[in-house]
């Protein structure tokens, strides 16, 4: 009876058609995945234990399908690391990598399945090696600070917008004045004042008219004496005083 109790979970799993196998390895090791209790497997699925390590979401996802051409189709995540060891997909070989920890499901045509639980040494929920916690703590501090800064910025913007809305509008600018006009430049002689013109005209009225001045009789006598010598064609000279 004591020997039967430890084997009871395994027996129940075989009866239910969902046998489970546990494997363990390190990155770089090769492990075999086998379908136990599934006669005609059609596909394999994988539910990662730490999906954040691979940038995946939770839940199972298909990783390999049987193909009529003989070469199974492998998901990109396991491409180059997962291959079949027989003509079908009943036995597989996987080259382990960090983050491969999880449960592998072998599904049959009648939806029966087997499970293989794989634990890769070094995989952790935080997906970080020991001694490098500082780099992962930085985003935890930075993200809340960014959130607080965003809230403060939105608050200040709201206050400024409300003040502008409540403040009276500025007065309209004054209309533009007329453009300055410039008088044309005319080169004209300065006009004399009327008073100056009257004085000038008065002086002109007082000036004596033209008259003959008294001539020196001695000169005239000398002229008479010379007239006997000079021919009669000589011109007469008159003196006019203005």
UniProtKB/Swiss-Prot annotation:
Pfam families recorded: G6B
Membrane topology: Single-pass type I membrane protein
Extent of motif ITIM motif: 210-215, 236-241
Signal sequence region: 1-17
Expression sites (tissue/organ): Expressed in mature megakaryocytes and platelets. Not expressed by immature megakaryocytes.
InterPro entries linked: G6B, G6B_V-set
GO cellular component, as recorded: cytosol; endoplasmic reticulum; Golgi apparatus; nucleoplasm; plasma membrane
Any one biological process term the GO annotation gives: negative regulation of signal transduction
Domain of life: Eukaryota
Transmembrane intervals: 141-161
PANTHER family: MEGAKARYOCYTE AND PLATELET INHIBITORY RECEPTOR G6B (PTHR37347:SF1)
Role of this protein: Inhibitory receptor that acts as a critical regulator of hematopoietic lineage differentiation, megakaryocyte function and platelet production. Inhibits platelet aggregation and activation by agonists such as ADP and collagen-related peptide. This regulation of megakaryocate function as well as platelet production ann activation is done through the inhibition (via the 2 ITIM motifs) of the receptors CLEC1B and GP6:FcRgamma signaling. Appears to operate in a calcium-independent manner.
Protein name from the UniProt record: Megakaryocyte and platelet inhibitory receptor G6b
Taxonomic source organism: Mus musculus (Mouse)
